[in-house]
């Protein structure tokens, strides 16, 4: 049952991606950009809502990442710094 569900989700995802790739060059180009979702619903943040649903505190996550950046090497710390920057906007 789980295997069938996963297969269906992957198949739908591939078909949706193929349809988007096929239609992307046929759609007219819009000069005016649409209104960002942040202006319409300022309190709606899907990442923060997902973390809250999982029971993960964003503040604790940010402080833990700051400690990680201090202990990592230069290559790995760049990736963690980018993640920390993205999460800092949620606090």
UniProtKB/Swiss-Prot annotation:
Q: Species name for this entry?
A: Mus musculus (Mouse)
Per the record, GO CC terms? Answer: extracellular region; extracellular space
The family assignment reads: Belongs to the secretoglobin family. UGRP subfamily.
Q: In which tissues is it expressed?
A: Highly expressed in lung where it localizes to epithelial cells of the trachea, bronchus and bronchioles (at protein level). Expressed in club cells of the bronchioles. Also detected in the anterior and posterior lobes of the pituitary gland where it may localize to gonadotropic cells (at protein level). Not detected in other tissues tested.
Reported function: Secreted cytokine-like protein. Binds to the scavenger receptor MARCO. Can also bind to pathogens including the Gram-positive bacterium L.monocytogenes, the Gram-negative bacterium P.aeruginosa, and yeast. Strongly inhibits phospholipase A2 (PLA2G1B) activity. Seems to have anti-inflammatory effects in respiratory epithelium. Also has anti-fibrotic activity in lung. May play a role in fetal lung development and maturation. Promotes branching morphogenesis during early stages of lung development.
Q: What is this protein called?
A: Secretoglobin family 3A member 2
Write the record's keywords in alphabetical order, separated by commas: Disulfide bond, Secreted, Signal
On the tree of life, the source organism's domain of life is Eukaryota
Give the record's subunit note: Homodimer; disulfide-linked. Monomer. Interacts with APOA1.
Q: Where can this protein be found?
A: Secreted
Please state what is observed when this gene is inactivated: Viable and fertile, with no gross abnormalities. Lung tissue appears normal. In a C57BL/6NCr strain background, animals show a mild increase in ovalbumin-induced inflammatory response in lung. However, in a mixed genetic background, there is a reduced ovalbumin-induced inflammatory response, possibly due to the presence of modifier genes.
Signal peptide bounds:
1-21
């Amino acid at each position: 049952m789980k295997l069938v569900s996963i297969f269906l989700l992957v198949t739908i995802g591939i078909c949706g991606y193929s349809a988007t790739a096929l239609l992307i060059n046929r759609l007219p180009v819009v000069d005016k950009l649409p209104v960002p979702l942040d202006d319409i619903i300022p309190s709606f943040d899907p990442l923060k809502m997902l973390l809250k649903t999982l029971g993960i505190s964003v503040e604790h996550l940010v402080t833990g990442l700051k400690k990680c950046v201090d202990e990592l090497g230069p290559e790995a710390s760049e990736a963690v710094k980018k993640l920390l920057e993205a999460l800092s906007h949620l606090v």
